[in-house]
Amino acid sequence: MKKNITYTIFATFSIFCLLVVGHYFYGGTESQSRGTQSLKKKLLEKRELELGQVKEQTDKVIDEPSALFNDPAIKQAWGLKKSAAARAWSVTQGSSDTIVAVIDTGIDEFHEDLKSNLWNNPGESGLDANGKDKATNGVDDDKNGFIDDVHGWNFVSNNNKLDDNHGHGTHIAGIIGAEAGNKKGISGISPKVSLMILKYFDPKVPSTDNLKNTIAAINYAVKMGAHIINYSGGGTDYSQEEHDAVELANKKGILFVAAAGNEKSNSDQHHYYPADYNLKNIISVTAIDPTTEVLSSSNYGVTTVDIAAPGQNILSCLPNNSYGLMTGTSQATAFVSGAAALVMSHKNMYFRAPEVKKYILATGDTASSLIAKTRTSRQLNLFKSLTILDSETQFSGIVSTGVNTRFTSESHGGLSLQNDPNLQKVNSVANFGKQLIETLNPGTQIKKKSANRLGIVPEPKVEQEQ
């Protein structure tokens, strides 16, 4: 049987934040004296200085999530800044079209920071033939085997009541997709995402078969079109049935983000499942503190754990419109799921799990503290995971006969130019393994030409493939 979720609650508290917005006005009157031109010059110089200071300040605060959103507790969410969330949000804030299935302890459906981002099952929404609300008519309108599963399903009690008697599921959902800019609480990594809630554990229900519920929840997520599955539970026992469920998700192109576990052990030697199943759609995540050290409670492994993300004292939602801190690989996993949601929505990479996985793993920031702890030695960087998708190779030079063309490349992965007796060819790996050859005639000038317009997608380099 699966072990129950392991994590630590450090505190729950009420948050009060005073937001002060300063406005500066500059003005003056000009005389018609001989000093008018001098005064104008001084005013212009002063204005230029002020504009320069504003630009300098803007460059500095782009890393601050509070510079973009007015959520009062956002400054206390250190993990957002650590993972470059503000820079990422300047690129995209995600989309409600992206569905993340959160397999956990349920959710507070009426939480002020979450209720707007709950997934709505289209087959259980709207009115039925009798004019009744499909969400509450007691009928399996979409004939998927679940009655009124408008936001997900409770596999513990086998009903649509998603109430969270633990708090963990609400906390995880908040990290992934709390609403942003609503002047309440915090912001999730992907603040416009749709959260499909699948409850597999309840501390108030004894003798719950967590493994059976997990498998059922995975199958539901696959059936109902989730793009990402976030799973924070796990155990040391291998389950072929669970493996097969995750493999089915893999075949559908669904990303499975799993916690590495809080067993204080080396997962290379002592496996933790489902994070350690050898499947290409799984991202195994460990937790780090603000100094990028892996938490002493977190599992690690240079062949089994893919990447690290913030996991200590993470501020997020709790039931009853409250907020609090939790610690563990569960929280780190939610960061990565949110990042994947942003990547998918930004480039319409739905049901392409291996590609999304490669982007996230290859674009993280390397850290010496992670060299012996993860496969990639990297920590999550939301901004880089998005901008590599938009990178355009800029190069210049003249294509000539029999002479190497000199060029510079700014794109991750780069380009190579090869000699040819008659032609010059631009070669690069495109779309993860497909060779692209663009033939250019001798004498063609290629100055600041975008390689992406030739169809090239720079391929992230990952040291080892799971």
Task: Show which residues each predicted segment covers.
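Substrate-binding/access-modulating region of protease and related hydrolase catalytic domains
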Residues: 95, 179, 197-281, 291, ...
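C-terminal subdomain of the subtilisin-like protease fold in secreted/lumenal serine endopeptidases
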Residues: 3-9, 19-24, 35-43, 226-231, ...
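Catalytic-core environment of secreted peptidases
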Residues: 147-148, 198, 287-330
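Subtilisin-like peptidase catalytic core
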Residues: 105, 143, 149-237, 289, ...
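Hydrolase catalytic cores
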Residues: 14, 175-176, 196-201, 227-228, ...
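Autoinhibitory propeptides
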Residues: 2-76, 120, 452, 463-466
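Acidic-leg catalytic submotif of subtilisin-like serine proteases
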Residues: 84-156, 175, 229
